[in-house]
Amino acid sequence: GTSGNSYFSKYPIENFNTFKDERLSKYIDIKKIKINKEDSFYLVNCHFNSFGISKEEIEYINDAKNIVKDTETYGKSVISKLTRGFKLRTKTTELLIEKLPNDDLPLIICGDFNDTPMSYTYNQMLKAGLKDAFITASKEIGKTYCGRLPLLRIDYFWYNDNIEIVDYNRIKQTTSDHYPLLISFNIKEAEELGEEQ
C-alpha cells in the first residue's frame, strides 16, 4: 500500500519544508501555521525508519522454542535489522533536532518514531527540552502500535513550554497497524509565559 500525510487546517500554512537525508527512507515535515497577524506555531510531522522485521521474524522472536532451532534462518537477519534500525533512527533524531526552529514560537512535533520511551531517540527529545504529551495528560496504557508486538508506545506528540496539553486520547480503531492519537492543546498567551519564567 501507500502511505503519506494530509494536513487539514482552518489556518493558513505559511511554509512547507520537508527534510530527508539521502540515507534515510523517511521524512521530517516542518510547517509554520499562522493563527492571526501576530500568532503562529510550528507543526512538525515525522516518520522514522522501522526495523523492517517480517511476520516470520516476529514469530521467531515471540516463540522461545525457535530461538535455538531457527537461529541460522532468522537470528542473523533479525540482529542485522535491529542494528540498521537503531543507526537510522539515531541519524533521523539528530537531523530532526538540528532542523527544529530556534525561535520562541509554540512547537508541536508528532509522528511515528518507531522507538520506545527507553530509546536514544526519546532521551534526545527530552534533552532538547521537549515534553511528552502522554506523560502529561494520558490516563491509560500507552500502547500505540496494534501489531503483533504488544504494548509498544512508538508514536509521540512532543511539545515545548509554549503549549499546554488539555487532553490525550488513543482512539481504539485499527484501520492501520497504529492507533490514532487525538490530542487537545492550547497555545499559551504571552502573559502566561512571562509568569512561568
Give residue ranges: language-model regions:
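Structured beta-strand-rich core segments of catalytic domains in phosphoester-bond hydrolases
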Residues: 1-60, 169-173
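A broad, low-specificity signal for short, low-complexity segments enriched in glycine/proline
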Residues: 1-7, 67-72, 117-120, 142-147
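Metal-dependent phosphoester-hydrolase catalytic domains
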Residues: 32, 98-107, 113-197
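His/acidic metal-ligating clusters that form di-metal
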Residues: 44, 85-109
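Active-site metal-binding loops of divalent metal-dependent hydrolases
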Residues: 48, 112-113
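A solvent-exposed, charged loop/short amphipathic helix patch at secondary-structure junctions
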Residues: 58-82
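Pocket-edge positions in alpha/beta enzyme catalytic cores
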Residues: 81, 85-88, 146
